UniProtKB/Swiss-Prot annotation:
This is S-methyl-5'-thioadenosine phosphorylase. The gene is MTAP. Its main location: cytoplasm. Its EC number is 2.4.2.28. Pathway: Amino-acid biosynthesis; L-methionine biosynthesis via salvage pathway; S-methyl-5-thio-alpha-D-ribose 1-phosphate from S-methyl-5'-thioadenosine (phosphorylase route): step 1/1. It comes from Bos taurus. One of its GO terms (biological process) is L-methionine salvage from methylthioadenosine. The lineage of its organism: Eukaryota, Metazoa, Chordata, Craniata, Vertebrata. Homotrimer. Substrate binds at residues 196, 220-222. It is found in: Cytoplasm; Nucleus. Keywords: Acetylation, Cytoplasm, Glycosyltransferase, Nucleus, Purine salvage, Transferase. CDD domains: MTAP_SsMTAPII_like_MTIP.
Amino acid sequence: MSSGATPAAVKIGIIGGTGLDDPEILEGRTEKYVDTPFGKPSDALVLGKIKNVDCVLLARHGRQHTIMPSKVNYQANIWALKEEGCTHVIVTTACGSLKEEIQPGDIIIIDQFIDRTTRRLQTFYDGNHSCARGVCHIPMAEPFCPKTREVLIETAKKLGLRCHSKGTMITIEGPRFSSRAESIMFQTWGADVINMTTVPEVVLAKEAGICYASIAMATDYDCWKEHEEAVSVDRVLKTLKENANKAKSLLLTTIPQIGSMEWSETLHNMKKMAQFSVLLPRH
């Protein structure tokens, strides 16, 4: 960026997962119901600020948790945040651990994913919307924004949180949990944690040219571990209740830091990548 140029303004979208979508983190909250070319997002957008940084919070499963993972309108959620001017999206997600060293209550700033979903639209460029013409072949070697991840990792260290600085998330279709055979297979594939929502959310954010990062909260050991209680809804909710403040404090401390940083080059590169990944129809 040339000297004297105005730094890029940032606006942070926050997508809250199960038990991690508390709107109280925002100051001066207002609600905004929107529609998109892809339908309605999961719930109202909650607009507000965290230490003077503009933020938009969206409950991934709806505020009453009525939307199962396969039915979340991921296209509408990301499109709505993009249209609201979000430059970044930081999400929270509950997950199961596939590694002994990733304990329930730990935070993982994931850097890779494996997709085991089967029923989800993974692109805006589906041939049905004039707002997204062409075919998009978005690069996915680095799915998550490295710069945003680095801020989250450094902030977690300063807060004294048990945080793993990388991890591969395997996303399953759900809503059922894995069988033991599947859980063990996923370990052999190199997955560290497992959830039901990272894909296609991260893919769509990349298509939208948004800096996307995820705060994953381990709630259980899935079902691979012998002599350990297998994952259940009760166990997930219990661990989230005991540890949700960790994700909350990480968001509240990281977002002002992001707001104070220079993002012009990063945002330019994200938008350029998204733009040049689209093949337009020949005329």
